[in-house]
């Protein structure tokens, strides 16, 4: 259900969610950040052309050193709700479920680690932004961006404390 006070704060494309184990592959998706939750969308109703346009804009912003934490024009809360309903593979994490959120500098890029309370257990999700894609034999990232995740980390921490 849409909370009309909720707003999309940022929409990141080419996000890689690491696999849970050595044998489980990671997945590509979009990370949609509102002021109440994170959503990792792997199956979307967004058109290929619109996705490609926003992905290219994001890549250019990385190259120019600009802020990439911004909403995608034309993608509203209603679209997010439809995408979340579209597939059980799409992931929704309420800020109230987040136990810890940190970033980790790696040699190859910057990793966002989100530890989530799932009731009887906790789980760590690991996200990073891909620079490009290798499409054969399976889609895999060619490299990862080095980035500052602190705007997202600060949003989650300040929202959780209120």
Show where each model-derived region lies.
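Acidic, Ser/Thr- and proline-rich intrinsically disordered linker/docking segments
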Residues: 26-28, 41-162
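The phosphoinositide-binding surface of pleckstrin homology
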Residues: 1-25
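Broad, structure-driven detector of short, well-ordered beta-strand segments within folded domains
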Residues: 29-33
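Structural motif
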Residues: 36-37
């Amino acid at each position: 259900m849409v909370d009309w006070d909720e707003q999309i704060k940022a929409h990141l494309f080419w996000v890689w969610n690491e696999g849970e184990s050595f044998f489980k592959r990671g997945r590509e998706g979009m990370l949609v950040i509102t002021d109440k939750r994170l959503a990792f969308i792997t199956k979307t109703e967004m058109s290929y052309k619109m996705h490609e346009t926003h992905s290219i804009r994001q890549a250019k912003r990385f190259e120019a050193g600009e802020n990439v934490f911004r909403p995608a024009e034309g993608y509203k809360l209603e679209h997010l709700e439809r995408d979340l309903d579209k597939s059980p593979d799409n992931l929704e994490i309420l800020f109230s479920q987040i136990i810890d959120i940190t970033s980790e500098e790696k040699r190859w890029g910057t990793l966002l680690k989100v530890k989530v309370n799932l009731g009887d257990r906790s789980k760590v999700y690991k996200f990073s932004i891909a620079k490009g894609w290798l499409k054969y034999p399976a889609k895999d990232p060619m490299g990862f961006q080095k980035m500052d995740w602190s705007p997202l980390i600060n949003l989650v921490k300040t929202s959780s404390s209120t």
